[in-house]
Amino acid sequence: MKLNNAVLSQSLPGYALPQYDRQAMARRSRQQPTWLHFGAGNLFRAFPAVLAQRLLNAGETDTGVLCCEAYDTDAVTQFLRPYDDLTLSVSLLADGSMEKEVVGSIAQSLTLPQDRCRVEEIFRAPSLQMVSFTITEKGYAVNAAVKEDMGRAPGEAQTLLGALAACCLARFEACGAPLALVSMDNCSQNGEKLREGFFAMLDAWKAAGHVSPEAYAWAQEKLSFPWSMIDKITPRPHESVQKALAADGWEGMDIQVTGKNTYIAPFVNTEKPQYLVIEDDFPAGRPPLEKAGVLFTSRDTVNAVERMKVCTCLNPLHTALAIFGCLLGHTSIAGEMADPDLRDFVTTMAYEEGMPVVIDPGVIEPKAFLEEVLTQRFPNPFIPDTPQRIATDTSQKLPIRFGVDMGLHLERGTAGQLQRIALVLAGWLRYLKAVDDQGQPFTCSPDPLLEKVQPIAQAIPFGTQATQEDFGSLLEDASIWGVDLKAAGLSALVVEDFNRLNQGPGAVRTTLEQLRKG
C-alpha cells in the first residue's frame, strides 16, 4: 500500500481520512489561495496542516493550505511531492495507542528559489488572507546571507526574508490588498522577530531606491505581524512508528536524514495535546481556525500565555529534568518521570515555587495546563524526547525559564523560599563539570557559553567544597541567571547546594532523595 491519491478511495480501518473532494479542494486553493505556509517540516505537517484538514472536514472552508520550503527543500521534493502532498500524522498516546490520519489539506508544495514565480503569483492574489511560518527562530535573523540580499534588487533576492519582502512588494503592485504574516515558531514575541527581519530588508531596499514611499507606507499600514504561542512536542520520526505503519501495510515509510541534517519521513509522530494562541490581527480576514481549537485573543494575552508556559508551567520543568537527567544517566524525559525523586522534584517545584507567581492569561487555566504536563505529556513513554537534547543552550534558557519567576519572588520578598529553583541552578554548575553522579565523564550538550563557564566549574575538584569566591563574578551575572544571585541573596544557597551535589559519587541522588523524603 502506497501513500498517494489512489489510497483515498480505499477502506483503511484505523485511519482517519480526508472527508472532502481533495481534487476540487486543490484546484480551488491554487486558483484562489487563502493560506500560504513557509516551512514544510515535521511541525507544519503535524499541526497547521492538520488544523486545515479539520476545517475542510467540517465544511468550514473549501480551500486548504499551500506550503513552501526555502531552507531544506528535500522536505518537499522527497517527502511531499512523491506522495501527492499527502502525509501520515500519528499521535502517540500515553497508553501506547496511536491515532493515525491521512492528511490531505496541502493543496500544493513549493520550494524557493525554484518556484519563485509561482510563490509571487500567490502573493498577487487578492484572496490570500494569511502567510504563516514555522522556520525556527534562526529563520528571522538578519544574517550574512540576508545582508547580501539587502544589496540586491528585490527580484534577485535569494533568502526567505528577501523573497518574502519582494513578494509583498509584488502584492502591493498587483492589488494592494492587506495581509497577515503569522509566525508560528516556538519563540517569544515571534511576530516582532518576523517584523524586524522583514523591515530590515525593506529599509535597506528603500534606502537603495528599490521601494517607493507608497509601497513602504502600504507595508507599514496594511501588513500585520500577529504574535502567537505554539505548543506541541513533535520529535523526529521514530522507528517504532515506522514499524507500526509497515505492519499496517504501508510501503516506503523509511526515515531519512537530509543534507541539512533534518530527520524526516512520509509520516510525522507527535503528542496529542496541542495549543496555538494567536493575536487576532488579520486585516484581510482569516480561515475560521477557532473552529479547529485555535485561540484568538489580544497581543498581551498571547504574551501572558507564553510567559505561563515558558516561565512556570513547562519549560523550567524541562530544564530541571534535563540537568538532573544528564547527571543521573537518564536518556528519556518519560524515564525521568518514572523516577520518584525527579518526578517529586519537578512537581513540588512547579506547585510550591512556580504557581504562587504564575501569570494567569485567562484563556488557558495554568493549573490544568500544568497538570496535563506532569501527568500526561512528560510521562508519555512514546514521545522519544531526551534530557540531552533539552540541555542544549541551557545558558540561554535560564534567564527566562527561572529568572522571571525569581524576579517576581524578589518583589514579594519570598526569594529565600526557592529551595528547588536554587538547586536547579546549582545543578547546572554541577553539570558543567561534565562528570555524572557516578563520577564518570560525559559530554555536555552544545552551549554558546560553555567555553566561558565550564572552566570555572571544572576548576573545583570533584568531591571538594567550593566557596562563593571560587565562582568569581559568575553568580552575579544577571545575563545568565536572569537576576544577580548575590544581590538577590541566593548565591550562598546556590553554592551550598553545589557543594551537596559535588560531595562525591551518589551525591546528586542522595540530595534529591532527601528532598523527596523531607
What are these regions (language model features)?
Residues M1-G518:
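Substrate/ligand-engaging "lid" and interaction regions
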